[in-house]
Structure formats: C-alpha cells, structure tokens
Design a protein with these regions (language model features):
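Amphipathic alpha-helical assembly/interaction segments
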Residues: 1-98
C-alpha cells in the first residue's frame, strides 16, 4: 500500500493514544473505534471509485468522532488537538476522495 498523509497521521494518533487511562468498558470501545480509523483508510484507499473510497473514509471519520467523544470525557488536551487535525484531514478526504 502506498502510504498517504491521512493514513500516516492515523497511525501516529493510534500510537499516541496507547497510554491513555480509561475504564475497561470505555477502553474496549475506544480501542475498537481507534483501530477502525487506519483500517478503513487502508481499505478505502484500495477501492477503484471515488464513491467507494468515500464510503470507507466516512466510516473512518465516524470512528474518529467516537474517539473524540471519549477523549472529551476522559482524555488529554494534546490528544484532542491531534484528533482535531486528523478529523480535518479525514473530512477533506470524505469530500474529495482521490
């Protein structure tokens, strides 16, 4: 897979979130949503049409919104800021998925 900027940002964000302290219930949901972001970016990047790519990019954005909500409840300001930057990149991909 040819790496692209948003995908690289999602991998870095995933690594940076690993030390976040959460309850076991919140941790499970957080991990699933966090992992979904780069996985959907990777899968979407392999799709042949813009419409197909956008579907996966929107799913990644939805997963990031879940993560952002958990960060609002339990997280740190630096992680929230990093999530906002990633969200801006994802939003652009969703609306211009080439």
């Amino acid at each position: 897979m040819k790496p692209f900027r948003t995908y690289q940002l999602s991998l870095q964000f995933h690594r940076d979130c690993q030390g976040l302290k959460l309850s076991s219930i919140a941790r499970d949901q957080f991990e699933r949503a966090l992992l979904s972001i780069p996985l959907n970016l990777a899968e979407g990047s392999a799709k042949p049409t813009e419409r197909d790519r956008a579907k996966f990019y929107f799913t990644a954005l939805g997963s990031l919104r879940e993560v952002q909500t958990l960060l609002e409840l339990f997280g740190s300001a630096p992680l929230r800021s990093q999530a906002d930057i990633l969200a801006a990149h994802l939003y652009r991909l969703c609306h211009r998925p080439h």
